[in-house]
A protein has these predicted regions:
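Substrate-binding clefts and catalytic carboxylate motifs of secreted carbohydrate-active enzymes
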Residues: 498-509
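Donor-sugar nucleotide-binding helix/loop cap in glycosyltransferases
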Residues: 575, 589
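A conserved nucleotide-sugar
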Residues: 353-355, 515-545
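Conserved hydrophobic helix-helix packing surfaces used for dimerization/oligomerization
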Residues: 324-328, 497, 526
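Alpha-helical solenoid repeat scaffolds of the TPR/TPR-like class and their adjacent stem/linker regions
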Residues: 1-491, 502, 512, 541-548, ...
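A eukaryotic nuclear recognition-module signature that targets compact all-alpha binding cores
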Residues: 612
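CoA-thioester-processing core
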Residues: 608-609
């Protein structure tokens, strides 16, 4: 036995020095002589886990526990392996057993906190970290982990205190610097966040998460090229970094960097089709006209980031009320496209039948749109510092009947709120063009152009078919004066094609089409939005590669909204992007009397332009192939009489179209809400709903 004890100590030394195979050999030799030696079984279990054989590790540690069930270390290490395998419930039980055996076991409390945080039990996790710190007051990892839990609960000030405490205990704590940077980015301190990401990378040069986070903050301050470099470094360290392939490609598209785009697209396509965590769903919308692909990517995202959570239990059916209580949830109750499209709906709701409550994810902003939206609701609740769980609880406490997500998977939104079932009926509308691909969104509002009946299988939700998918106010802001070509930097003559979509929506394919159109229409120019300086330079280079003088592409500077709307009066034809069409921008153009030529595809976002044109009864502006789109643009530019006739038709139709009649569209939406609520009250499952035009 003595010899074996010495051998065991030698194995521990090898393990501490990283000589895992040597340590494994010694443990196996011990077990040949003493097959029931629990310490050797336990250590061998730990070693094979370190050598990437977790299944065998569990078997070995369990054997050790059978022999010596009152060893807290065995249970704690078993929990570590179980957690690594995703067996979080089992891991939690193992940590509880370790704590029951040794109530002062700080590491077990810390590890249990990690499992609780991973299962959306952040408050319980904080209690576990508090216990760990009670027994080891200078436990840096527990401070760091508690900071992460506070971050999950959006208690950012407490998180910052925890991360700084962890760093004061362990000054070379790279993970704590990275987490501190993440919180600083969240509270609007990108430059300070950048410093902390750089510090994390200095300490841990191969820290992939720090490179990824640094890329995010660089992108947020319009340093796209530096962001790309940081993303590429993260991917070099970890080629399968979750969802990074799409983010990297999306960032390149933001600056119109199309080098090797086709090869990158094909690689990304393959990853998504294999069910890998390859891309955020929104990053695919301007790259692929494929609703099936969009659904696959969204399923991977939602299962990873926002799985269904039943911790609040079923919603108790409340007594019938005189009014249906509608909750609208958004990060965009401000000067934003979503508010431009929705504020008139809020104001037009029938308050005898509906009560409206807003849940705003963003802090108050000092702009007219925020105040207008705020005034349109019966209650306007700022929930930016509440956790997803707390917002869902709040929604239930208020008795929300129908929860309407106005943002989906766009920036700053909170689909996690809906994962807890904030209301009996949950709806996606307006801000996000695609399926949420999960079981807890019941309905998606669209129209028959956007989602034909034969496309329903690409959507997890039941479809609400409105006569008009979107609407905007008749009484729009107007410029105080009429702008001239000269004021906008445009030549005094020549046909003006325009596209005021964000540059990220421009693909090499559609740009090549535009260049052929310019080549065919002598003296014509292309008037584009200017998203960023790098994009402008890259677009000019692309024009040269198509043998088009870059001076024929004029970039519009930022203008106040009223003056921006006036620029549509200068242009002759709006060329839509594909596969990601214009939405609010299309409505602005059409209301201003500017014809919009669109190319229709299969995906939600590639059919929005056609939706608006069909509602306006202008099918002659819808193209079904790139060749048709190109020839039609050239034809209209060379046929002034035909274009004048289309303008007259547009001007006549817009005044009687639901596209510009929010009161009418609100009635359609209210009819849909009533049908949804009737289904719920009758204990019927959601089903497709068609709202007839009156």
């Amino acid at each position: 036995m003595v010899a074996r004890s010495e051998d065991y100590k030698e194995a521990l030394k090898h393990q501490a020095s990283g000589r895992l195979a040597d340590a494994q050999k010694i443990c196996e030799d011990i077990l040949k002589v003493q097959p029931e030696n629990p310490d050797a079984l336990h250590l061998l279990g730990v070693l094979v886990f370190q050598l990437n054989n977790p299944e065998r590790s569990i078997d070995l540690i369990n054997r050790a526990i059978e022999i010596h069930p009152d060893n807290a270390d065995y249970h704690c290490d078993l929990g570590i392996v179980q957690a690594a395998l995703g067996q979080l419930g089992a891991a939690n039980i193992s940590y509880d057993k370790a704590i029951a055996i040794r109530p002062e076991f700080a590491q077990a409390y810390n590890n249990r906190g990690l499992v609780q945080a991973a299962t959306a039990q952040s408050e319980s996790a904080i209690e576990s970290y508090n216990k760990a710190l009670e027994f080891i007051p200078n436990f840096a990892a527990a401070y760091c982990n508690r900071g992460i839990a506070h971050t999950q609960l959006r208690k950012y000030e407490l998180a910052i205190v925890d991360f700084n405490k962890a760093i004061s205990i362990q000054p070379r704590y790279g993970e704590a610097y990275c987490n501190l940077g993440f919180v600083q980015e969240r509270i609007g301190q990108p430059n300070v966040a950048l410093e902390n990401y750089n510090k994390a990378i200095e300490i841990l040069p191969n820290y992939d998460v720090a490179y990824y986070n640094r890329g995010n903050v660089l992108k947020s301050i319009n340093k796209h090229s530096a962001a790309i470099n940081s993303y590429e470094k993260a991917m070099q360290i970890r080629p399968d970094f979750p969802f990074l392939s799409g983010t990297l490609l999306h960032t390149k598209m933001e600056i119109c960097d199309w080098e090797d785009l086709e090869a990158h697209q094909n690689a990304l396509l393959s990853q998504v089709e294999q069910g890998k965590k390859a891309s955020r769903p929104l990053d695919l919308h301007n790259l692929f006209d494929s609703p099936s692909l969009h659904k696959l990517a969204t399923e991977a995202w939602m299962q990873s980031k926002h799985p269904r959570n039943t911790s609040l239990g079923e919603i108790t059916k409340k007594p019938i009320c005189n009014k249906i209580r509608i909750g609208y949830y958004s990060a965009d109750f401000r000067e934003h496209a979503v508010s431009h499209l929705s504020v008139d709906i809020f104001e037009s709701h029938n308050r005898n039948k509906f009560e409206l409550i807003a849940f705003s994810y963003r802090p108050e902003v000092n702009d007219g749109m925020y105040k207008r939206v705020q005034g349109a609701f019966d209650q306007f609740i700022e929930v930016r510092n509440q956790s997803d769980l707390d917002i869902a609880k709040h929604s239930r406490d208020l008795g929300i009947d129908i929860a309407v997500d106005l943002g989906g998977l766009t920036s700053g939104q909170r689909p996690g709120v809906f994962s807890y079932r904030a209301a009996p009926t949950q709806v996606s509308y307006l801000g996000y063009g695609g399926t949420m691909a999960c079981e807890y969104y019941d309905y998606l509002m669209a129209d028959e152009t956007i989602i034909p009946r034969e496309h329903q299988n690409y959507y997890s939700e039941k479809i609400v078919y409105l006569p008009s998918y979107q609407t905007s106010a008749l009484h729009r802001a107007r410029a105080q004066k009429k702008l001239t070509r000269q004021e906008l930097g445009l030549p005094e003559s020549g046909f003006i094609f325009c596209c005021f979509n964000n540059n990220i929506k421009i693909t090499p394919s559609i740009f090549s089409t535009w260049m052929r159109i310019l080549e065919a229409v002598e003296g014509s120019i292309l008037f584009l939005n200017a998203s960023n300086a790098v994009a402008i330079e890259n677009i000019k280079k692309e024009a040269l590669s198509h043998r088009i003088n870059p001076d024929r592409i004029i970039f519009k500077k930022f203008l106040p909204r009223a003056e921006h709307l006036a620029t549509y009066g200068i242009a002759d034809l709006f060329l839509d992007t594909f596969p990601y069409n214009a939405a609010t921008t299309a409505n602005d153009a059409l209301w201003s009397g500017l014809p919009l030529l669109t190319l229709v595809g299969k995906s939600f976002v590639s059919r929005v332009g056609a939706s608006a044109l069909n509602v306006l009864q202008l099918p002659e502006l819808i193209s079904y192939s790139q060749a048709e789109y190109e020839s039609r643009a050239i034809e209209l530019a060379k046929s002034p009489a035909q274009l004048v006739a289309i303008r007259k038709k547009l001007q006549a139709n817009r005044t009687r179209s639901p596209l510009f009649d929010p009161k009418h569209v609100t009635k359609y939406i209210e009819s849909a809400y009533i049908k949804m609520h009737e289904h719920y009250r009758s204990a019927l499952p959601p089903e497709h709903i068609w709202i007839a035009e009156d």
